[in-house]
Amino acid sequence: MDLSAVRVEEVQNVINAMQKILECPICLELIKEPVSTKCDHIFCRFCMLKLLNQKKGPSQCPLCKNDITKRSLQESTRFSQLVEELLKIIHAFQLDTGLQFANSYNFAKKENHSPEHLKDEVSIIQSMGYRNRAKRLLQSEPENPSLQETSLSVPLSNLGIVRTLRTKQQIQPQKKSVYIELGSDSSEDTVNKATYCSVGDQELLQITPQGTRDETSLDSAKKAACEFSEKDITNTEHHQSSNNDLNTTEKHATERHPEKYQGSSVSNLHVEPCGTNTHASSLQHENSLLLTKDRMNVEKAEFCNKSKQPGLARSQHNRWTGSKETCNDRQTPSTEKKVDLNANALYERKEWNKQKLPCSENPRDAEDVPWITLNSSIQKVNEWFSRSDELLSSDDSHDGGSESNAKVADVLDVLNEVDEYSGSSEKIDLLASDPHEPLICKSERVHSSSVESNIKDKIFGKTYRRKANLPNLSHVTENLIIGALVTESQIMQERPLTNKLKRKRRTTSGLHPEDFIKKADLAVQKTPEIINQGTNQMEQNGQVMNITNSAHENKTKGDSIQNEKNPNAIESLEEESAFKTKAEPISSSINNMELELNIHNSKAPKKNRLRRKSSTRHIHALELVVSRNLSPPNCTELQIDSCSSSEEIKKKNYNQMPVRHSRNLQLMEDKESATGAKKSNKPNEQTSKRHASDTFPELKLTKVPGSFTNCSNTSELKEFVNPSLSREEKEEKLETVKVSNNAKDPKDLMLSGERVLQTERSVESSSISLVPDTDYGTQESISLLEVSTLGKAKTERNKCMSQCAAFENPKELIHGCSEDTRNDTEGFKYPLGSEVNHSQETSIEIEESELDTQYLQNTFKVSKRQSFALFSNPGNPEEECATFSAHSRSLKKQSPKVTSECEQKEENQGKKESNIKPVQTVNITAGFSVVCQKDKPVDNAKCSIKGGSRFCLSSQFRGNETGLITPNKHGLLQNPYHIPPLFPVKSFVKTKCNKNLLEENSEEHSVSPERAVGNENIIPSTVSTISHNNIRENAFKEASSSNINEVGSSTNEVGSSINEVGPSDENIQAELGRNRGPKLNAVLRLGLLQPEVCKQSLPISNCKHPEIKKQEHEELVQTVNTDFSPCLISDNLEQPMGSSHASEVCSETPDDLLDDGEIKEDTSFAANDIKESSAVFSKSIQRGELSRSPSPFTHTHLAQGYQKEAKKLESSEENLSSEDEELPCFQHLLFGKVSNIPSQTTRHSTVATECLSKNTEENLLSLKNSLTDCSNQVILAKASQEHHLSEETKCSGSLFSSQCSELEDLTANTNTQDPFLIGSSKRMRHQSESQGVGLSDKELVSDDEERGTGLEEDNQEEQSVDSNLGEAASGYESETSVSEDCSRLSSQSEILTTQQRDTMQDNLIKLQQEMAELEAVLEQHGSQPSNSYPSIITDSSALEDLRNPEQSTSEKAVLTSQKSSEYPINQNPEGLSADKFEVSADSSTSKNKEPGVERSSPSKCQSLEDRWYVHSSSGSLQNGNYPSQEELIKVVDVETQQLEKSGPHDLMEPSYLPRQDLDGTPYLESGISLFSDDPESDPSEDRAPESAHVGSIPSSTSALKVPQWQVAESAQSPAAAHNTNTAGYNAMEESVSRENPKLTASTERVNKRMSLVVSGLTPEEFMLVYKFARRYHIALTNLISEETTHVVMKTDAEFVCERTLKYFLGIAGGKWVVSYFWVTQSIKERKMLNEHDFEVRGDVVNGRNHQGPKRARESPDRKIFRGLEICCYGPFTNMPTDQLEWMVQLCGASVVKELSSFTLGTGFHPIVVVQPDAWTEDNGFHAIGQMCEAPVVTREWVLDSVALYQCQELDTYLIPQIPHSHY
């Protein structure tokens, strides 16, 4: 359900985005009769005419202020068609999903015309007016009541509601709050309100059949409403007058649906028991409107002025109608359940009223409430429902009304009973009687209302904060919640099926649980519906409110429940939560409503409004999520879960969390309120939250430290993050909280993570604009709450849980993050202007258009969406920064020490942010994002990854490091961050963000968030990691990912600065300075601050990292990978070498950074014990795929970043200067070494070199971090070895093994190599610089560029490698993966300048030549000649790529494309980095390549150093590569040794030691997962997989590793390190190579023993195969070759497959053609199973059991085409002619190239094979027979013969030949 819900949510987001785009800026509704102005802005004709008619003369365009006239307006049929199509899509979406589209108000408008809708709407529509509605409400003129009365009276009479007028009169005072809902102005508000209205409409619809019942309800509801109004009068009195008309309508609704009223009262809906309708709209409207009462009036006036009111009203009406339609569809159930709901609501209201104001205005309610009567009442209600169906169907009769009256009393009794558990069964019966329809109605209503609210909030930036009278609330909440919770638990228990039905029915709408609850509790149902609507509204309107209030309410509820019915309620609630927190939704909604009501009661109107706005935004996202994931019910559940997840937990969670939430939120609010327009809402939110906190200070303080922090931190934080959004999310979150409490957090959190992801995405989006409210509520709340609260609450496990949630969420959060990022970006685009409104607007817009932004981003590559999506915007980086901070804090949270420090820092940051509010507005957003993202690191990580990730990190680190740093960094750095860093961030962010965005688009933002998470986490975490061994391991992983993040994400800016930082703190700072002010700021933030952070966070990180490792080892890979950059920087700052090492290690897990989406896969894989490499690989694939599509973007950004980075690198050349200056020396040295390495390396050289360029860079850093890099190199060497072995499969084998290895490397090296590529290039630079390794040459050449291009390449390589992985996977799937890779690369290259392209092309040509030479050399040379050859080709490509860094990405693209085609994966990953690296200088390029090779084999590097020097000068990669081949083997050996040594070296090197210790001996960067998993076998496996990547990288790794040892020493003295490292490099390489020959040989033997090729597999499946191959040291190639032993086919359960080229070639070659199940089963059984049981038995064309593969394998000597001469003539599709000829040759035929070449009379039978459908000439092939005396057959003869492995008769396949004369 989550997946479908997620998909639905994505679709809904896209539709929402489209809707948003097609909205009229004036009325904020879908454009009707669109007209375009001469300024090309589109508006509704009506809106424009109204605008133009307002004054004489020309008016101004609302958007651009240009003069417009009626004459200038032109009809825009295109837009009208778009709108029509969108409406159709929405309609289809609603039909398909059963969800009421949140923004379907346009349909609702159309639907409004339906009589039922008109009837229903009348009561609600009378509510009236469009823009005048607000005025009416403000004026509370009778005109509206009269309107309502007239319209209502008509529809009410139609509906059978005769008492409409009377009800209106009675309820008018109470109705005001209801009408406030009408006053939502934004389309989103309208959507939300429409939802509310729709609730009301549904209620009206329900009322329609229950006119009399409504009257009855009205009577009781009126009484309740009176009570309620009295209670709420303080809040609603001023609104009552304004809402009189509305009140009338709503009163009907309220009377009809006391439950709604109850929800309303609960949510401070005034005393509108009749507010079923009123309550639905009133609750939600009141929540938003009451909350917004004053604000609503003002806003309504404003909105009216903005002419948004009409749109709002319309949209509200539309939504109402939509809701009504929904209700009408399920009108009978609606009315029934509404009566019951009314009863329930009335009862609860009465209960509440009794508790709150024992006002006896509802004596009947009180009388009706008797629990004793409930059972009979429920029965009556059931009967009435059955009758109400008739009533509804027959007429809106007064019988229904009177029955309704009786029923209402019964319902009230039922409600009482239900609350007392007495009527639960009957309630369930009611529910059962109408489970689906009521649920749907409610779900839709809730959905629409929440959407409405969200839209409103988003558009108008309302932040509804509930300063709920928590005491009152607690009482009311106690009773209501107790009753509701009890009822809910009962209901939940009794209607789990109903809930399921509801969910099934409305899978997408998140209201199912609530709907069920509502249905189950007729009253409860309505109440949940209304409450859920209210909750949705509250959560939408005041997610913060809901959060705070919910928290408070939950606290209150928990407290009161504890006090009153706590044990039972809690138990029941826990049961409920066990049941699925179905009762919880009601509880939550009731709590939310009560909270709202309390908030309303307490002067929370404005704050509630603000909170509601933010909440609405949240809800919108949540709604999307809810809609998709049944979020509303779930959300309610979640809230209830929070509250009721186990009531104890709920109490604790909400009480503690709310407490923490309030405090943290307050901190966040303070911080966030500093952010621009957010401030306006934030203060309210803050106030509300503070009030909440103040109201429940005891609860907060008391509960926070309690177990709730454990649960609440993740759950509540997430709840807070997405109160409304989190409704469903909360459900899951709370479930996850429960899970978290139960140590199930990861899974549940992952589930909730998706929603949280999306909800938080929207929440974060909202929170970004409304950072305090939303971010605070969503992510900020999580982060700050977790950080601050954790600090306050001392809940480190909570932090862990929170991190768990955050990391579990990453997949989902990724979506949210990206969306958030975009939202933030958009919000930041106009951060201060209408920040709240815009932010909220953009929040919803982005939430709605999450997919849309992805589309648009891909579509409009460099358009504004890209910028906001990519966080190119300055605001975005800040957001990212905040996100990063949040993640960092999250990580800190994970580590108790880190958490407290982080929390303190965060709090300091919050305080300082508050102090620096203006400057920190955006920064705060970023900071808060960071904070928020602690709990959902992925989400924020995404943001942080997006652009501000590094900066976020640094800012957070600043915050984390010290309060002082926080203000300085937030104020100063964040400003630079905002401004100067933003630009670097822009380029770097664009590079990273682009890639990330693209990746995120592809990966659902999985990569970036996690990356960012890792990044942020790692900054503190990695920093401390450096200090501690445990942290080292984590730092290895984290640093790896962080390095990748920083190197990959902020590769250009921060990455280079990290690289610069790598050499030393001074270097970091100097490099930062050189990199640029912004970069310096970023680096200083990251690096300088990180040193502090490092120092401060080290212990913290230490604790944290272990925790993180334990909790999210995979995510550590992800997180660590993500976090490595910060770690790197902090490490570098703290321990330059350690930093570099960490960086290098980090760069080993760039996949996480590279592919968070793949990390998702990885997460799933991780579950399979493939966590790290799998995660990396998953990421790699997705990232690769992402890279492909985003590559242009990424490349552009990368190119930009690259250029900038190059400049930065050059500018930061002070540090790099030694590097660069020494690089030539190192190049020479290294090239001498490399010359030895290349021959070996060249095989992997492409990959290795490419990787090496990254690896070299990284290894340069790594050399500084020699131990880490040694580990990495060892792993890489092993990988390289294995890769070599993998590549033993000859060209394709080697190539593909390279690719495979690369893929594996990407998997392993995604952890290792991708980060290696990313971080490696940076590190390599640093290492080159500090180590003076031959790698430096490459880095010299590409150091500046590697910084720029290297960073770019890192990013690209991340993408490239990932895409290569994905491509290899898809290459296996489709042979076009190469072209995909190529296209991706070429698209990336398109971004490069023409000059660069030309250079790259030239270099490409040279590299190709060298590759050819290298291939020849490698074939001749090297222990794996055949493998070497492919490796060489691959390496050559990689080397070419390495060489061509300056050449252009285009050349690289070409090169990569070529390589891709040849070795799709192999070359791209490294080709990119290599290209970029080598782009720096051609000679350098050559050298770089060689150094990359050299890196591959350190010992070879030594020997090659001189040789390479010569080669370098000669530019003969060949020569260099020949030794490289040897060296490669040596390197593998060396690497193996180094792996062994690296551990000791790590131990030797404190900074390096930690990483290596962490990873164990294996190279942590690439071997993190590898060596962590299997130091010996997995490292080899990892390396084998890495080999392709490590093919070069292993050399790099090896090369780096030896130096790294010395670099470890050298790292202490960078200058010395160069020479020492070089020497050590050589010595170590030699020693390793001495030791490693065996390893190499064994690996080669393993690879020779088995070589896999996959066909038809998805990237995920390919990743699994890759893991499998890596585990068993099997070569995994992309192309089949003679060395291939197994072809893994995608088959069905009967081992029947599709026919693919590899299938045919595998059969023709007598290879094992086995099913993919062989791999899966072997993995399951943890042993390699016999292939016999999994051999493919048949195919879909030739038969399902023809046993062709077995026949071919068992008869290798029996060639089916023996004695045949076959000429493959003419064009062929789907298969190259040479492949067809090879296939024929493998089957024993002799191939003839030309028809004239047939050797007639030699005993050979000539046959001509053609493919007629491939011929463009119709009859060209018919005359072939005349050209030669040979039968002409179709290609099918060959294919069928090969598939069956039986030579088929020619007769069937003969092509009739036309006489030559006819031809």
UniProtKB/Swiss-Prot annotation:
Chief location of this protein within or outside the cell: nucleus
EC class: transferase
RING-type zinc finger locations on the chain: 24-65
Location in the cell: Nucleus; Chromosome; Cytoplasm
Region (Interaction with PALB2), start-end ranges: 1397-1424
Modification Phosphothreonine, positions: 1394
Pathway membership, UniProt: Protein modification; protein ubiquitination
Protein task: E3 ubiquitin-protein ligase that specifically mediates the formation of 'Lys-6'-linked polyubiquitin chains and plays a central role in DNA repair by facilitating cellular responses to DNA damage. It is unclear whether it also mediates the formation of other types of polyubiquitin chains. The BRCA1-BARD1 heterodimer coordinates a diverse range of cellular pathways such as DNA damage repair, ubiquitination and transcriptional regulation to maintain genomic stability. Regulates centrosomal microtubule nucleation.
Record's protein name: Breast cancer type 1 susceptibility protein homolog
